[in-house]
Amino acid sequence: MTDFSPREIVSELDRFIVGQADAKRAVAIALRNRWRRLQLEGILREEVLPKNILMIGPTGVGKTEIARRLAKLAGAPFLKVEATKFTEVGYVGRDVEQIIRDLVEVAIAQVRERKRKDVQARAQIAAEERVLDALVGPGSSPATRDSFRRKLRAGDLNDKEIEVETQASSGSPMFEIPGMPGGQIGAISIGDIFGKMGGRTKTRRLTVADSHDILINEEADKLLDNDQLVQEAINVVENNGIVFLDEIDKICVRDGRSGGEVSREGVQRDLLPLIEGTTVATKHGAVKTEHILFIASGAFHIAKPSDLLPELQGRLPIRVELNALTRDDMRRILTEPEASLIKQYIALLQTEGVTLEFSDDAIDALADVAVGVNSTVENIGARRLQTVMERVLDEISFVAPDRGGETIRIDADYVQKNVGDLAKNTDLSRFIL
């Protein structure tokens, strides 16, 4: 788990996301509070519960991007799910407890990756011996092995093909056990029941270079205690897990509506115990959810936060409102982030030998077009910039292979020539921009 201070977390998010200071502060404090709780002892640590967050704001202003960047920063098990993917228990579809099961799988993969690094040196030696066995045979003399080992370490044998025995991928057929609680837990792999069937292997023909990572991972896994690894992963989920629930507004029940809304309310009711704290059965063991941090987000265009069940509102105590993007924000989004759209397009066309240059007035014009179309057609926030940029650079992208070595300057006139008419014609921009 990361121990960044809130200020460091915000400054890291600032590298990729423009504006939305309140939302950044809220998630930074929530993330730091996870670390603070782990410094406490005994009963107090158990009593301190996470303050779950509800992010409210129109589409395309950075809600999901904040979640994505937070996942990379957190160094903790993180899962982003759409609330609309789930159905009430008893209906066909996934139930909300699957969120926790998926989170456990994410944690196991993270812990396994970390532990593999701890035993990498030993795994590398064992993998090297397996490659030498394939090259010169297990019964070869020490002198021959040493000679080939030197060549192997120098990289002289990287292109040589060898045959190695590797673990067969666990693509065991799945079947459902009727009546098992929690819907998806009923899908059991035959491999889970009968174990690894004596460790099934298959012979693969690979180059020495390609076999390197596969063999190291296999040898590392042999050195790991799987039961201890799973237990550690469950512990990490219970104390550090973060779930980002997107599109929470789509499961709101609006006043005066009925019929299909029933299962939406059911999903909310199923979420209540999960967020409040319950024990979820997974195939790896029971997982307590009291200390998992939930961050919910929604545009709330049609529904309002007050349309959520009152109990669910109470379980999301921190409200953060994200602002709609202004023209100045659009301009900054085009230029400031480390992987801004303009930098991406310049890099893409550089691969063809074409140098793109954007003048300041071109950036102003792009921002103006995006804001104009958002205000007249449908406000989709920063995502509109991608549509506008694609339209502006359509011709250049098409002919780039024939124009290697050229420098092309994009100015306001060029932008207007390519999208100006479409932006003014509302009927056309509905379909094209």
From Swiss-Prot:
Function: ATPase subunit of a proteasome-like degradation complex; this subunit has chaperone activity. The binding of ATP and its subsequent hydrolysis by HslU are essential for unfolding of protein substrates subsequently hydrolyzed by HslV. HslU recognizes the N-terminal part of its protein substrates and unfolds these before they are guided to HslV for hydrolysis.
GO MF: ATP binding; ATP hydrolysis activity; peptidase activity; proteasome-activating activity
Broad class of the protein's primary localization: cytoplasm
PANTHER family referenced in this protein's UniProt entry, alphabetically: ATP-DEPENDENT CLP PROTEASE ATP-BINDING SUBUNIT CLPX-LIKE, MITOCHONDRIAL-RELATED, ATP-DEPENDENT PROTEASE ATPASE SUBUNIT HSLU
Cell compartment(s), UniProt: Cytoplasm
Alphabetized UniProt keyword annotations: ATP-binding, Chaperone, Cytoplasm, Nucleotide-binding, Stress response
Gene it is expressed from: hslU
GO annotation, cellular component aspect: HslUV protease complex
Family: Belongs to the ClpX chaperone family. HslU subfamily.
Superkingdom of source: Bacteria
Quaternary structure annotation from Swiss-Prot or TrEMBL: A double ring-shaped homohexamer of HslV is capped on each side by a ring-shaped HslU homohexamer. The assembly of the HslU/HslV complex is dependent on binding of ATP.
Residues at which ATP binds: 18, 60-65, 246, 311, 383
Segments crossing the lipid bilayer: none
GO biological process: protein unfolding; proteolysis involved in protein catabolic process
HAMAP family, A to Z: HslU (MF_00249)
Protein's name according to its UniProt entry: ATP-dependent protease ATPase subunit HslU
Coiled coil (residue ranges): none
